[in-house]
């Protein structure tokens, strides 16, 4: 697997998992389907990709997890909201043990169990017309707009 180390913003989530730290993760097994589908070069491109998902709700939470399961190496999650019980019917992170937790933090913890090599940058903020350029100008390959507030659409 490509080396994912390097300069990372200070707010990149420190990965915590319940996995045995002595355990070896076999990325060929874990992401072999991605390599078979997209080829070695495609899988390597995904490992190097920097993708930002803005809005970690009913669309964004599913998109963020799908990207992690595809082997994307760098993800940024942007949302200021907390996981609520009323999110359970539509948001992948809405589980009993995460109600009240920041959505971005809940997703970072979930992703650490799916793709431990993935670096997750958590930005606890809403995107507004005033801060959009600052949040979105970080060299992302792709930005996914999953915002539910029309005023914040950029």
What is the predicted role of each segment?
Residues 100-142, 147-153:
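A structured beta-alpha segment of the ubiquitous adenosine-cofactor-binding alpha/beta core
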Residues 74-115:
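Glycine-rich phosphate-binding loop and adjoining beta1-alpha1-beta2 segment
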Residues 37-41, 64, 128-134:
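A generic local structural motif
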Residues 66-69, 90-93, 135-138:
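Short, glycine/charged-enriched secondary-structure capping and boundary segments
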Residues 28, 36, 40, 57, ...:
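Electropositive phosphate-/nucleotide-binding environments in soluble metabolic enzymes
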Residues 47-68, 74-79, 84:
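Glycine-rich adenosine-cofactor-binding loop
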Residues 2-52:
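N-terminal charged helix/coil linker that caps or initiates catalytic domains
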């Amino acid at each position: 697997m490509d080396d994912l180390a390097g300069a990372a913003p200070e707010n990149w989530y420190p990965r915590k998992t319940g996995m045995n730290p002595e355990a070896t993760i076999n990325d060929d097994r874990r992401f072999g389907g991605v390599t078979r589908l997209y080829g070695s070069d495609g899988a390597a491109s995904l490992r190097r990709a920097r993708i930002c998902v803005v809005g970690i709700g009913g669309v964004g939470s599913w998109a963020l997890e799908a990207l992690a399961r595809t082997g994307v190496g760098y993800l940024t999650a942007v949302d200021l909201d907390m996981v609520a019980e009323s999110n359970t019917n539509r948001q992948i992170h809405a589980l009993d043990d995460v109600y009240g937790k920041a959505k971005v933090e809940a997703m970072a913890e979930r992703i650490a169990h799916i793709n431990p090599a993935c670096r997750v940058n958590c930005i606890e903020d809403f995107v507004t017309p005033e801060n959009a350029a600052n949040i979105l100008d970080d060299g992302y390959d792709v930005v996914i707009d999953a915002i539910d507030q029309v005023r914040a659409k950029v």
